[in-house]
Structure formats: structure tokens, C-alpha cells
């Protein structure tokens, strides 16, 4: 009742059961720009308690890969056994890798002017933003979440894991 009353007062016709999202024009994704499709590996699920241990990305323009970025991250953490089992990454693999500050500085430069794309982007971006903030690095890139898109567009899938979606 409140929504109908507000709609009538505003002179608009409500369409009940429909969600609408408004974006400022400045937030619309430019289809001509480059895209950075990326994935992180971490030591756990919470950016405040866990570390980034690998960043992998490809930059695309006009549907073609134009650059690549891949590095392990070594801040002296020991990789928990369950993370090694999940990712295949061992503590020894991090030896000689750059630290988080260096990796995120380089990744920031790599992503400059690009839209970011990730499967479960909220997870990856929470780690990127949290750890970048420790070094006064800010990521303002727009990003697209392929997990959200698959849930919205592919209703018949048994799940929306990346392997299933691909």
C-alpha cells in the first residue's frame, strides 16, 4: 500500500515484483575500453585476517588478450594445509615472490583505465581494497561480477561455479 501511494503521488506507474537499478551515466561501462579479468588466491575468506598469495590476470581489448599479469605474493606467511589442498600453492612456491605492497602497486598500474572482471568479484575486490588501503593504494575501477551475471542469466544451471558456467 505504501509503495502504491508513493507511486501515485509521484505520478509514476509501479510494476510490482520488478527490481530496477539506476546507475549514474559516469558508472556505465564503456564497451570500447580494455578489461582486466582477474582472480586471486588467498589464505582464507576474510580479508582482515587472511592474505593474498597469488594474483593472476589478463587484459583484453576488442576480445583479444593484450597483456598478462601473474605473480605469487610473499609476506612471510605459511600456507595452511587446507589452502594448499584447495589451490595447489605451497609455502615454498612463494619464496622469492614480491610482497603485497609491490604486487598491488604493479596490479594497480596494470589495471589503470580498465574495467575489472572476476567470478565472485565482491570477494576478490574485498581483498584488493582491504590490502591496498594498507598502502594508500585505491582501486576505483568499475567491475563486473560473472557470478552475479550467471545467476541472473543462467537459471537452469545446477550451480554457478566457474567450471560450470564456462
Regions from the language model: what does each represent?
Residues 95-112:
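Catalytic-core regions of hydrolytic enzymes
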Residues 60-64:
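Short acidic-glycine loop/turn motifs at beta-strand connectors
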Residues 51-53:
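Short coil-to-beta strand junction motifs in C2/discoidin
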Residues 8, 47-48, 100-103:
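Transmitter module of two-component histidine kinases
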Residues 66-68:
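A structural motif specific to WD40 beta-propellers
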Residues 1-38, 59, 110, 115, ...:
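Phosphodiester-processing cores and adjacent nucleic acid-binding clamps
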Residues 40-48:
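Short acidic, Gly/Ser-rich segments with clustered Asp/Glu that frequently serve as metal-coordination loops
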Residues 70-97, 125, 132-166:
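Active-site-proximal helix-loop-helix substrate-binding element of RNase H-like nuclease domains
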Amino acid at each position: 500500500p505504501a509503495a502504491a501511494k508513493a507511486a501515485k503521488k509521484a505520478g509514476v506507474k509501479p510494476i510490482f515484483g520488478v527490481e530496477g537499478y539506476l546507475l549514474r551515466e559516469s558508472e556505465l561501462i564503456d564497451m570500447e575500453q580494455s578489461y582486466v579479468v582477474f582472480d586471486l588466491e588467498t589464505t582464507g575468506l576474510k580479508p582482515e585476517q587472511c592474505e593474498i598469495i597469488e594474483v593472476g590476470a589478463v587484459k583484453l581489448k576488442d576480445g583479444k588478450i593484450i597483456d598478462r599479469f601473474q605473480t605469487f605474493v610473499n609476506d612471510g606467511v605459511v600456507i595452511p594445509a587446507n589452502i594448499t589442498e584447495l589451490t595447489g600453492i605451497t609455502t615454498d612456491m612463494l619464496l622469492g615472490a614480491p610482497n603485497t605492497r609491490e604486487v598491488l602497486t604493479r596490479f594497480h598500474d596494470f589495471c589503470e583505465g580498465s574495467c575489472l572482471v572476476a567470478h565472485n568479484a565482491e570477494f576478490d575486490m574485498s581483498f584488493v581494497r582491504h590490502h591496498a588501503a594498507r598502502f594508500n593504494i585505491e582501486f576505483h575501477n568499475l567491475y563486473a561480477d560473472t557470478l552475479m551475471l550467471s545467476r541472473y542469466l543462467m537459471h537452469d544451471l545446477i550451480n554457478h561455479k566457474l567450471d560450470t558456467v564456462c
